[in-house]
Amino acid sequence: MLLVLSQRQADKETVNFLQSRMKTVWVKLESAEEFDVKAGIASGAFGLVTDGDPKNIAQAYAELDGLKGGTLSRSPLNVAHRGDPFKYNENSMEGFRAACEAGATHLEVDAHLTKDDQIVIMHDADLSRTTNGRGNIRSMTLEEIRQYKIIRNLGNMTTGSESDIPTIDELFSYCRDKEILIFFEIKSSASDFVSVFKRKIEEYGMEDNIVVISFDRTQLSAVREHIPYLWALDLNYTKENIGKTITDLCTRGVGIDMSYGNVLPQLTRSMLDRGFPPAYWTYSTKTDVETAIRDGVYGITNNDAVAAGALPEKLTFGELAPVKKSEFLSEEFTLPVFVESYDGTRTETRGALYAYRDAGEYAEVILRAETGKWSLLSDVVRVEYASEENSASSSEDGGCGSFVGLPFACAAAAGLVLVLKRRRG
């Protein structure tokens, strides 16, 4: 699903809200002037649309190529595959809580339907692999299923603890008041699954918090028909002609989430150019997650979301003191900024100017800050001007630190942004 926002609509928070639900955002720039172009890039949107000279956008990206280490314009998704699936029992509430508390942006869960039409969270159709019981979920009532406990992790090793088999009610009760989204995989082929699922979504007010994923194309079609406000991703992908794949996805009105074995720069770019954000599964470790980020992957389903929670996610600000207008002209100008990790840890540092615009009584700025992994870009920030006659304000108040030009690097990791030149008339 592709959404085109005006530049006034496209602040970082709005773009992230939409794209974290796997909806691709492009921004219609107000102009092709330098600040508007860089603000469009910093919004994190996957595409820029201009009526102006596209060479200005190309020039902005040319500046990125030489930047050491790369810079992210958007925060990739830290999707916790079956919770924290090696430390805790697989698909258990304990694992879900641990992942959320450690910085997962999404939970990836699996669901089946019981004999009495209750949705339970479990990967396999049978209880035997992960629990201390046996039996096919579809042929058992919820009461029968709840006699048993989850005792194994994703590696099929006993954890030494027992966990209740979660229901959709328990999952939704936990998630609905938190800033956590769900990649909800439909494992069941039951024809009434989607109707039960819809009732639960609306009962718990989860309409904005779910992306459906499935290998079952019949269920994906049912979701798009009966729960049209949910976006759905097909987990199937074959290395057929890319044009046929895109045509099929568009015909069925779904997106795609592919096995990470298919990660190729050309494929990622081809999908992104056609409005499909790059999402892949399932990465094993934090190191793999870092590699995925540098490879340009946005939706990163992984088994190590707790450790990945320590990775730098975004820049945030405290209260910024007024700054003399003349100080913005210094190549060594910086402002205080916090690097915030997925787990909420904040580290204070200095951000250099990526872009500056004089708005009369105040300045609009975009900052870039190093994190030790990659650099991050801020949203557009308003900074009040201080009086030029006020000697108490010095360059040190504005900050001093290393600054190299007005750089931005999306690298392969940050985003493959499409620039369109619209024809008039």
Q: How would you name each of these model-derived features?
A:
Residues M1-S330, P336, E364:
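Phosphate-group recognition and catalysis centered on beta-loop-alpha active-site segments
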Residues K115, Y342, E370:
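Short, ordered coil/turn segments that flank beta-strands lining enzyme active or ligand-binding pockets
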Residues E332-D343, L367:
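Beta-strand-rich structural segments
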Residues G344-R368:
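Serine/threonine-rich, repeat-prone extracellular segments and beta-strand-based repeat modules
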Residues E370-V381:
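Short, exposed coil/turn segments at beta-strand boundaries within extracellular/luminal domains
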Residues V380-G398:
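C-terminal low-complexity, Ser/Thr- and acidic/Pro-rich disordered "stalk" regions positioned immediately N-terminal
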Residues V404-R423:
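A cross-kingdom C-terminal cell-surface attachment/processing module
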